Every structure is written in C-alpha cells, then in structure tokens.
C-alpha cells in the first residue's frame, strides 16, 4: 500500500510540474517576442545608400559604391 501511495504522489507531482513549466514557457515566448519587437530595424533595399552591411536588407553593402546589393 505504501508503494502505491508513493507512486501516486510522484505522478501528481510530475503532472503539476509539467503543467507549471508549460505555462512558464508560454510567458517566456511572449516576453521574447516583445523584446524582439523592440529590436526590429528598418533596412535599405538593394540599390539604396549604405555605410555598412547591417543597414541593408540582404546584409551586403558594396564598399566601392556605398550601395546595398
């Protein structure tokens, strides 16, 4: 009887822990989405002026012509 009680309590704890971690994961995903929205940037399309590759949508800036390729 003691073994059955221990198994039952262990199963209850595992179920509760799994449900709790799923809830936390959903909030984590929402928080990271909000964080990413703050870091979104506008980019320059191909042919536009640029000073570095990070300004271009395709991440390539020609240093010879200072344009996004």
UniProtKB/Swiss-Prot annotation:
Residues 18-41 form a propeptide. Expressed by the venom duct. Pfam families: Conotoxin. Keywords: Disulfide bond, Knottin, Secreted, Signal, Toxin. One of its GO terms (molecular function) is ion channel inhibitor activity. GO terms for cellular component: extracellular region. Residues 1-17 form the signal peptide. InterPro entries: Conotoxin (IPR004214). The keyword Secreted applies. Disulfide bonds join 43-57, 50-61, 56-68. It is found in: Secreted. This precursor corresponds to allele E1d or E1b. Has not been merged with other alleles since they may differ due to geographic variation (see strains in PubMed:19606224). Belongs to the conotoxin O1 superfamily. The presence of a 'disulfide through disulfide knot' structurally defines this protein as a knottin. The cysteine framework is VI/VII (C-C-CC-C-C). This is Conotoxin Eb6.9. It comes from Conus ebraeus (Hebrew cone).
